Amino acid sequence: MSVPLSYTWRNLAARKLTTLLTACGMALVVFVFATVLMLEEGLRKTMVETGSPDNVIVTRRSAGTEVQSLVERDQAAIVENQPEVAYGIDGARLASKETIVLIALPKRDSNKTSNVLIRGVGQKGIELRPQVEITEGRMFHPGSTEIIAGKNIAERYKGAGVGETLRFAQREWTVVGIMDAGKSGFDSEIWGDVDQLMQAFRRPVYSSVILKLNDAATFPQLKSRIEEDPRLTLEAKRESIFYAEQSQVLANFIRYLGMMLSIIFSAGAIIGAMITMYASVANRATEIGTLRALGFRRGNILTAFLVEALMLGAAGGIIGLTMASFMQFFTISTMNWQSFSELAFSFILNLEIILKSFAFALIMGVVGGFLPAVRAARLNIVDSLRAV
């Protein structure tokens, strides 16, 4: 015979203030836990969606990032003429020789400057990225000092809106379009003509070469040929994998810092739940004795108090997840430690994060309620009935 759930529920409802405060304490911990997971997922999604599995990025061997990479002009010519590279409808190869440069720009809401990544792209650069769309203005003309800005750059930095001008590399550059890259890393970049940018920054070499495969299954052959060619000191990776690796350092930092904070805060929430449950046991000693006298076993009492603790944890989980869900409406920016430029991304809540956060809340409830539940189950019947 088990203790009815209605009994447990009425006990929580009878102590509204204590129940609410305990649940809110757990909710704050769940909020921190879920927000960290959402932040990590947002960063991962932003970086992974920057790359396409059909594209290959070729950089200098062991460079790690495009910023550190150098690809000679003759090497780039060899790479883009590999047989696995696809052709466009105009008969030209779908390859883009690109250069990466960092500049400092002032933000719109303050005069503080931050690094922004400038990407020089070839004529096929935007065709290789189907997720990129020009939402305002137009594409820049090849051979000109026109540029297009990612929507996050246009919103956050002075001079990055359509019709405005930016001055860098001793030239005036006119912003002629805004691109929406589907919440990928390209939203935090400025694009221009690769040849003009290389001349302006006096760079004789490219940073990378982007290729589209005519068949994704031919990647191993392309990779082997490029990396074994003695004329080249380059390595080839699928673009999606390359950008996913770029997010690892920052994602790991966010994860470990968030987990440490969650553990510290959860200790406080568990202690709070434990105090609440101990007080509940002390105040209901007579009730517990009556239940035992009516035939309920120690295991039934233990289960009833654990269910009560689980209900507290569930309430905290629901409140915390509800609070965390509103973070999806915010976009934050941080330094990408791989490229040393600012990267903007959003919080993303998915089913996996919901389940992990709710499970975390239930675990806090069980841990906080276990010892008080054991105490309740071990109370002597006669002593309990004498309690007033």
Describe the function of each predicted region.
Residues 1-6:
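Short, membrane-interfacial amphipathic segments enriched in basic
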Residues 374-388:
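Short cytosolic juxtamembrane segments of multi-pass membrane proteins
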Residues 27, 31-117, 136-138, 143, ...:
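Hydrophobic, regular-secondary-structure patches
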Residues 16-43, 251-287, 310-319, 363-367:
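Hydrophobic alpha-helical transmembrane segments of multi-pass inner-membrane transport and secretion
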Residues 114-156:
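Short beta-strand boundary microenvironments
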Residues 328-355:
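Short juxtamembrane loops and helix-capping segments at transmembrane helix boundaries
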Residues 278, 283-332, 356-368, 372:
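Transmembrane alpha-helical interface segments in multi-pass membrane proteins
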Residues 86-89, 95, 106-113, 139, ...:
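Mechanotransmission and gating elements of multispan inner-membrane complexes involved in transport
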